[in-house]
Amino acid sequence: MTSKLEQLKQFTTVVADTGDIDAIARLKPVDATTNPSLLLKAAAMPRYAEHLGNAMKQCQGDIGLACDLFAVAVGKQILELIPGRISTEVDARLSFDTQAMVQRGERLIGLYEQAGISRERVLIKIASTWEGIRAAEQLEKAGIQTNLTLLFSFTQAVACAEAGVFLISPFVGRIYDWYKKHEGRDYQGAEDPGVQSVSRIYDYYKTHGYKTVVMGASFRNVGQIESLAGCDRLTISPELLGQLAEASGTLERKLEPGRASEPRISLDEKSFRWGLNEDAMATEKLAEGIRQFARDQEKLEALLTELA
């Protein structure tokens, strides 16, 4: 019988959430995503030692540039194995500075183009803060497509759609983690708050004709993935991709256009900030995610500095 991974690929674009070249070659996803935490793991792999050294040689003492050069080198190597796109993230410490994020996104695209990679194969990942969404809006108008990450709330999703961003990455597992901790119980299938969040966003986007791609991210188990079968894209860790590849049985499509959704709404900055503030889970998880990515960025910089 066809594996659940192959069945999933029939109605959802499968993306690998990793910088592990071997896993990508084995699992054959369409796209791949990276972030500072995954790049830090990649930096510890012997196969990337040459990329680290080259980044330091080319950066002229600018450690931030060295990190971008390393990210692009990893991204280019991944693109040799996949037909689609790579997502590369802007320094999370810039998450509240619109113009700095625009400039960093433009630099990353410039580095990819210098490496012979067209911008059509790259998504610039940016945190879904108000400032990040505004930066993405500017980049999209300049022909640079974006992936809005660390998205935990319907408010963030609405603002991203209104800004015309190419893709959003709502985080299923981290939402699940928060509710499991605070409610003291487990969740399965359609009752999982993370699954419910992505389902709501998907239905809203399809009902109102938004072109923004919904890519569920941050999964804790195969059940969450199966409950979102039919979502535009799902970015999945090699471990869970492996489990799906080994699983048999029928996988039913759960999300599809045409399901009912709520009326269209519009958000200005005040209503965005209030809506996010009213969602304790999203507020905590957005701040925590930015801090974690910033810490891993600093660790990567320290690693590169040691090579200087």
Curated annotation (Swiss-Prot):
Name of the molecule in the record: Transaldolase
Keyword check for Lyase: no
Family to which this protein belongs: Belongs to the transaldolase family. Type 1 subfamily.
Active site residues per record: K125
Assembly behavior: Homodimer.
Catalyzed reactions per annotation: D-sedoheptulose 7-phosphate + D-glyceraldehyde 3-phosphate = D-erythrose 4-phosphate + beta-D-fructose 6-phosphate
Gene: tal
Key words of the record: Cytoplasm, Pentose shunt, Schiff base, Transferase
GO cellular component: cytosol
Organism: Stutzerimonas stutzeri (strain A1501)
EC number: 2.2.1.2
Transmembrane segments: none
Record Gene3D superfamilies: Aldolase class I (3.20.20.70)
Function description: Transaldolase is important for the balance of metabolites in the pentose-phosphate pathway.
Subcellular location per the Swiss-Prot or TrEMBL entry: Cytoplasm
